[in-house]
């Protein structure tokens, strides 16, 4: 009979294990509610050994949330193929997968809870927002985005973040509906901006020309057309004068 010998982990391997264990615990409870003792027990090591790999609780929490931030930013990566609406819908699916899997940790990352210093948390989430912004700009195929386009994309990224945080508080709206709604929100933000700027109008028209009727943007137009006849017209005296 052969007796198994427990392999000793290297320093980096052990650090990565502890980060993974911490993230798993953060998926169930807020980071500030998770103790080093719990992380040590889940990793199968002693509390002093945790401090051998991380100088303090703060450094372990920062490392764990940094990995979460990197993973969240990666959810916005998408091949540059197919209509934009379908691409954004896939991105939102992966984004909400992350939110669903790491609820308390996601909230802590976005809100900069006491487990992580505010400056560190802000730097992490700013990195996620910038990565998301750059990905969307790349999908739009605009080398030098005008100011209005930057405003649209950054506003939409913030909207996705806020929507996810609100959804986590009770999950009162079906997730799939929110994913689609956020894609529609992007189209709406872009369309409103296009109404004020010729360059934005050109970008929006180019995007819509590549969208199929059964895609997310086509669905939005169908929904708007469906209720348009029932909307009372604006009285002539209330229309803005040109």
Protein language model annotation of sequence segments:
Residues 117-146, 150-162, 176-191:
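Amphipathic alpha-helical packing segments from all-alpha helical-bundle domains
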Residues 63, 77-104, 142-146, 179:
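Hydrophobic alpha-helical connector segments
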Residues 98-123, 134-137, 161-169, 199:
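Amphipathic alpha-helical segments used for helix-helix packing
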Residues 59-68, 109, 124, 128:
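Alpha-helical DNA-contacting segments of helix-turn-helix folds
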Residues 62-63, 73, 190:
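Short, Lys/Arg-enriched C-terminal cap helix and immediately downstream tail that follows
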Residues 17, 25, 29-59, 63:
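Helix-turn-helix
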Residues 1-2, 134-138, 169-242:
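C-terminal peripheral helix-coil segments that are non-catalytic and often amphipathic
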